[in-house]
Amino acid sequence: MLTVLLASRNAGKLREFEDLLPGMTLVSWPAEAPELPETGAFFQDNALQKAEGARAWWLAHGTESVDAVLADDSGLCVDALWGGPGVLSARFAQDLSSYAERNRRLLDLLPTDATRTARFVCVLAWAPLLDTAGERFTVSGAVEGSLALEHRGSQGFGYDPIFLPEGFDQTFGELPAAVKHTLSHRARACAALRAKLGE
């Protein structure tokens, strides 16, 4: 079984990755480690930045053995907001303390007659800890859908309670995790990762 450093402190992401990658032992990014850079214009750029930053820090300071680093950059892309918040999803409305408040602000940005189509995108970057242990690569997943009129449900995290996946009348915040994990952007990216690794 591979031991993998997850380059994130996001508890929601860690829970999802534990469900979606049961063949791996995940080590979360430690509290004493620095924030990882996210200065790219695209999800792939940010995922690679985080993977390389985490790999370099772990080689110098890591306290346990890991085989590889896994970094995620993901976000919500709303057509009526020209693809926003996109790569800025994690930093959107940071002056507000709760996901519910941030979701309300996002919904308030939409004109009443705007199209509500949106998609969740996830890019994963894989970096073996040692250069001799294989290639670095990225995989991605996306799920199409639309924005609900209001915050609905308490499952998941982030924008889940306002996102209606295509073909469903429940948000990710209302759907059971077992259902979400069959169709979410992160589930699809993890499936691509497992395929690439030959699992």
Where in the sequence are the language-model features?
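Anionic-ligand binding patches
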Residues: 2-5, 9-199
